[in-house]
Amino acid sequence: AGWRLEIKKYPLLTEFAAWRTDANWKKWWNGGRKYLRFDEPGASGGYYTQDDMKEIIAYAQQHYITIIPEIEMPAHSEEVLAAYPQLSCSGEPYKNADFCVGNEETFTFLENVLTEVMELFPSEYIHVGGDEAGKAAWKTCPKCQARIKALGIKGDKKHSAEAYLQSFIITHAEKFLNDKGRQIIGWDEILEGGLAPNSTVMSWRGESGGIEAAKQHHDVIMSPN
């Protein structure tokens, strides 16, 4: 837990969201899951500067290794929302784990972060996460519900409208990255709602997600739990 890569456009990610209140993860997880500024007493954490990462990438390339970065969306974003709470549905820190998909600033943030990531990482692939989105806040968020209405999204027997809203943010990131010559990898939840054929699915919830992705002619990485 915590943000681990310097993003120059968003300094609070490493001044604040990279530092937990406890070095022991279990104690931190069960003790409120709060973050501190790097210069506050008790702050525990750290991050890679962009210069650090350039050095690591160069070393990896010398050893024929490609480093693929992961920028998680729309869930597992508590640390981002602690630093930039306006990107959450509530507008408050420590209330939500998912980005507000009805907020245009969310997409600006993600595109800016991905741009800096692409400037650092030569990998053809960028992992966009996509797993374990709770979506509960989206059901009562006026902005998310307005987005659902504007897109004409309807729930059906397979998935809720909010599940298809997750597909919207993933396909938005996919198009943004494809336009820059990159391809996405995502956890198997990204299958819900449809994907472009060049997307790679990483199956972690057993083997069924990978099988379904292969049936849809996607490349698959099997990593079942």
Tell what function each PLM region has.
Residues 1-182:
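Substrate-binding cleft of carbohydrate-active enzyme catalytic domains
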Residues 127, 179, 195-202:
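Catalytic cores of carbohydrate-active enzymes
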Residues 142-147, 187-198:
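Active-site clefts of carbohydrate-active enzymes
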Residues 126, 178-188, 220-224:
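Acidic/polar loop patches that form or flank catalytic/metal-binding clefts of enzymes
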Residues 69-73, 130-132, 188, 203-205, ...:
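A cross-domain feature marking catalytic cores of carbohydrate-active enzymes
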Residues 191-197, 204-225:
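Conserved alpha/beta catalytic core and glycan-binding cleft of carbohydrate-active enzymes
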